């Protein structure tokens, strides 16, 4: 397949000889347009970019200072949109020779054939994978699936083939450093961008010592983005609870002259809960999960979830109290049980709303 219409984007900071090996491999495997970004490298490393620029197929973009991998990628995307009108897409590659050129070509060809954004994913079960990388990927993928609702085998892969139609969006999202790649995945979800995964070789050179990834700072930036969905869901729930309680008090005070006893409580509780539920539904649909589900259908599913959840709260609380023989007069233990049940149902509600009520219909093909 002709790859002249695919640009390779290659961000690099303080490279060594491996950068030239990467470029030679890409050229040997049919790529004819490489956008190399010097992200503020030190003067003693600039000769690698000069050597690379001697190839007519290589265009070098320079950052005067280190701006981060995300900024380098976005700068290249913007350059391609303005200067490569015939490019059908790009494939991003790391400059440390961890992406084999055959895998890069496979991802680019798959993107051209399907029109889908394509991720080159590593197999972290291989024995030569550093333990830190293996455990880190497992944790990140699990957290990503739980709190974002996307099943991705390798959330930090730098090998990504991206159709031109997605470049304008992806060049405008936030994040200038390693967190940008996580923001890209989140943008794929919220904008319903279909994606596929292609298995690639898992290569670690010298325990990945050449990586500029800062373990604590960059990990915090990434996890902060992943947990943002859950944080917004928590805020939405708290605001709805405040509205629920406030409306109950207002209605109770306003209607006590015409209603009394059970009728007053029932009208106040049901009305307050209904209005606060509608508010919670709207916030979750528009601001938390950014769902494109039809409003009526999503609302029906929301209440289908809410009603059983109410009974589950009662049955679980009562069941635990009975099973463990908690005395009815022991208000502290009963309160602890109720709080634990509420926390359990809160996580369950988040998961069900994310994966069913407001489910984003990203389509991912089977791994090849």
Please tell me what each predicted stretch does.
Residues 14-28:
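Short, well-formed alpha-helical segments that are part of the catalytic scaffolds
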């Amino acid at each position: 397949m002709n790859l002249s219409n695919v640009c390779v984007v290659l961000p690099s900071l303080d490279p060594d000889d491996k950068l030239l090996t990467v470029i030679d491999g890409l050229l040997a495997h049919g790529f004819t347009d490489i956008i190399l970004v010097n992200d503020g490298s030190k003067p003693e490393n600039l000769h690698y970019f000069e050597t690379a620029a001697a190839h007519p197929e290589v265009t070098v973009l320079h950052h005067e200072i280190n701006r981060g991998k995300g900024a380098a990628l976005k700068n290249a995307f913007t350059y391609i949109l303005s200067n490569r009108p015939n490019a059908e897409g790009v494939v991003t590659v790391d400059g440390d020779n961890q992406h084999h050129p055959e895998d890069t070509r496979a991802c680019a060809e798959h993107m051209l054939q399907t029109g889908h954004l394509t991720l080159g994913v590593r197999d972290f079960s291989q024995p030569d994978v550093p333990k830190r990388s293996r455990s880190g990927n497992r944790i990140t993928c699990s957290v990503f699936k739980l709190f974002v609702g996307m099943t991705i085998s390798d959330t930090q892969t730098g090998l990504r083939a991206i159709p031109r139609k997605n470049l304008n969006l992806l060049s405008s999202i936030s994040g200038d450093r390693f967190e940008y790649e996580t923001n890209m995945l989140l943008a794929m979800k919220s904008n319903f961008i279909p994606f596929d995964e292609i298995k690639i070789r898992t290569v670690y050179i010298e325990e990945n010592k050449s990586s500029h990834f800062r373990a604590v700072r960059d990990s915090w930036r990434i996890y902060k983005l992943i947990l943002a969905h859950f944080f917004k869901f928590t805020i939405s729930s708290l605001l709805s609870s405040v509205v629920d309680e406030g409306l109950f008090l207002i209605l109770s005070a306003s209607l006590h002259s015409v209603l009394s006893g059970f009728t007053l409580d029932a009208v106040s509780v049901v009305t307050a809960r209904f209005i606060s539920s509608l508010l919670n539904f709207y916030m979750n649909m528009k601001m938390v999960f950014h769902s494109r589900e039809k409003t009526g259908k999503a609302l029906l599913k929301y209440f289908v979830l809410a009603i059983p959840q109410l009974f589950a709260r009662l049955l679980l609380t009562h069941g635990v109290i009975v099973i463990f023989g908690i005395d009815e007069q022991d208000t502290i233990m009963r309160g602890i049980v109720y709080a634990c049940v509420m926390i359990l149902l809160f996580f369950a509600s988040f998961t069900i709303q994310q994966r069913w009520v407001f489910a984003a219909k990203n389509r991912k093909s089977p791994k090849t």
